[in-house]
Amino acid sequence: SLCQALARRARKAGAEVYRNTPVTALTQHKDDTWTVHTEKGDIDCEVVINACGYRVNEVGAMMGVQHPVASMEHQYFVTEDIKGIVDAGHRMPLLRCPISDYYCRQEKNGLLIGFYEQDCKTWGMDGIDPHFTNALCPDDLDRITDVLEGAFARMPALQEVGIKNVVNGPITYTIDGAPLVGPIPGKRNAFCIIGLRAGLGEGGGHGWLLAQQIVHGEACYDTWCIDPRRFGSHTNVELTALKAIEDYQNEFRFHFPNEHRPVGRNAKTTPLTPILAAEGAHFTVVNGWERMEYIKPTADFHVIHGFGFDKSFNRVAADVAAVQTNVALAEVNGFNRFEITGA
């Protein structure tokens, strides 16, 4: 497997790999080095990396950190052989259907079909069984009935074959759908590479960028979009779970520029927020803060998001012109504020 190949190359480079060795605690010392405590003894190291998948917050708790990562149950099944595939003489194309929320690819002489159902479930929010290793969740095909109808309509051959096996397991989500790769906020010599939905496919590139940050202090590219420090203290467990559900439900939907989805809004407001709302303000969100973008000309003013300029462009332009030529007041709640005292 890929994991074994990576471990083999790591050993050749001098790494030590410990299997079946549960970590029980992490201790950071005054010189910022770490001791990893395991059931088989302690390991002293300079740097600790949290790359623990769905156990991210168990390890985070050992550092005193709560990461904005939640797990969702995700199901797919593999069919028995399909005659049309056996006789085709070529591989079937990968299919992703944003209307019915499923994806499909050939698996031997059958099909593997995965689903992003609206009736989705978080996983492990109340703790994870310590013995849940190389394990799966119970099947729950009733939850994906509505999605199955779309798949059957698109591929009638599915109704003529049986299901060979069903897989239901946890995958991780962050608040904005992007992973957390880089230094852990508030900790020294501590990094993470977590919140990846497809570690097998994403691990190589993200691991390369993380290695550069650890060795050189920064990566060769701007990595702010995956930096763990991009989230503030408002990203609690409840908000993380709600945003994970929203992201799962919108897996195959475009996220347009300037689109801010409704879940988890009003996490941070000021006394001016309801006053501006009463004046017809349209709000965006910046690090949890509700920030006014423009004043709607009418109560029924509605913007349809896309990749071009929308109706809000002229509204913002008018506000900019007014500020340039007149005196204006603006609420800047999303900016940093520093209190400096002393001589």
Task: Write out the residue ranges for each language-model feature.
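Short, glycine-/Ser/Thr-/acidic-enriched flexible segments
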Residues: G41, Y54, G84, N109, ...
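Glycine/proline-enriched, intrinsically flexible loops and inter-domain linkers
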Residues: Y221-D222, D227-A343
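Flavin-dependent oxidoreductases
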Residues: A25-P138, D146-R154, N236-T269
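A short alpha-helix-loop-beta-strand transition element characteristic
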Residues: Q66-V69, R96, G217-D222, H282-F283
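General beta-strand structural signal in soluble alpha/beta enzymes
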Residues: V17-R19, N50, I113, G162-K164, ...
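Helical element adjacent to the flavin cofactor pocket in flavoenzyme catalytic cores
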Residues: S1-V47, G204
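C-terminal catalytic lobe of FAD-dependent flavoproteins
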Residues: A5, I99, K108, T122, ...
